[in-house]
């Protein structure tokens, strides 16, 4: 994880120098930690914040981590030897409550299943969610909660709620035991797509950084056909693994341009 953290620290430092040169912040805050620096910058100017997700920053270390050999060993035990990385991939900088650009709670996800946010084409297929904190995830800074007992019910009804996002309808969530999952930096949470989960508000004064990724058997639909997937591991066809960073960058650039209605 450290190369990913270093990459993000370098980007934030570069952007901080830009903002300072434009008189948009009062200082660089270079003495502050990875968990703290973005908070201090965003208190003065938050234009960096929307740039940080993996498909926008598109860092080389992030690309390499998607197919990290140690991670692939874990994923292959569940998915099998032919693995594709879904385009549902995020690096999340969860700011303290109320500090995100629109004034809402940044990355406070409501109760949902990952199966509820993909197109129906993916419904018959297994998709594995991998969630990793880049810093310690606690109840104070907004760790995850899950309701494991409901996964046996399959896909529950979801709806889009203004200011909240896609969430499970209330009547589908009976009184069940909720597990709160504080985690250490570098630990891994594995979820199948039917486990209801949410993140809680960040009530600390630091950023809760995390990565969440989706993996599935190569050849199965991702439920996000408008964004790029790619092969990260293959025993039968090793040459099919995407190792070229520039190609991955271009795949995302073109997909994002098309989604805005702009032809590259």
Place the predicted regions along the sequence by residue:
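Non-heme Fe(II)-dependent double-stranded beta-helix
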Residues: 1-111, 120
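Double-stranded beta-helix
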Residues: 137-196
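Non-heme Fe(II)/2-oxoglutarate
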Residues: 17, 160-161, 188-190, 195-264
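A short secondary-structure junction signal
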Residues: 97-106, 111, 121-122, 140-146, ...
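Short edge-strand/loop segments of extracellular domains
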Residues: 96, 147-154, 208, 214-219
């Amino acid at each position: 994880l450290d190369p990913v953290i270093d990459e993000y620290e370098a980007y934030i430092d570069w952007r901080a120098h830009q903002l300072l040169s434009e008189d948009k912040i009062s200082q660089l805050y270079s003495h502050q930690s990875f968990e703290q620096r973005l908070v201090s910058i965003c208190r003065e100017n938050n234009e960096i914040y929307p740039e940080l997700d993996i498909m926008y920053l598109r860092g080389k270390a992030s690309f390499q981590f998607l197919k990290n050999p140690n991670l692939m060993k874990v994923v292959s035990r569940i998915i099998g030897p032919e693995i594709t990385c879904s385009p549902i991939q995020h690096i999340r900088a969860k700011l303290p409550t109320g500090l995100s650009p629109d004034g809402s709670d940044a990355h406070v996800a409501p109760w949902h299943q990952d199966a509820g946010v993909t197109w129906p084409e993916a419904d018959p297929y297994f998709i594995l969610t991998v969630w990793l904190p880049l810093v310690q995830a606690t109840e104070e800074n907004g760790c995850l909660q899950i309701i494991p007992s409901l996964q046996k019910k399959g896909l529950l009804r979801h709806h889009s709620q203004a200011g909240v996002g896609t969430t499970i309808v209330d009547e589908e969530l009976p009184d069940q035991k909720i597990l709160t999952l504080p985690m250490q930096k570098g630990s891994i949470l594995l979820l199948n797509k039917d486990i209801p989960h949410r993140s809680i508000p960040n009530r600390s004064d630091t950023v809760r950084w995390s990565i969440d990724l989706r993996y599935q058997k190569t050849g199965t639909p991702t439920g996000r056909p408008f964004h790029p997937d790619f092969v990260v591991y293959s025993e039968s066809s090793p040459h099919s693994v995407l190792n070229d960073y520039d190609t991955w960058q271009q795949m995302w650039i073109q997909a994002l341009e098309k989604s805005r209605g702009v032809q590259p």
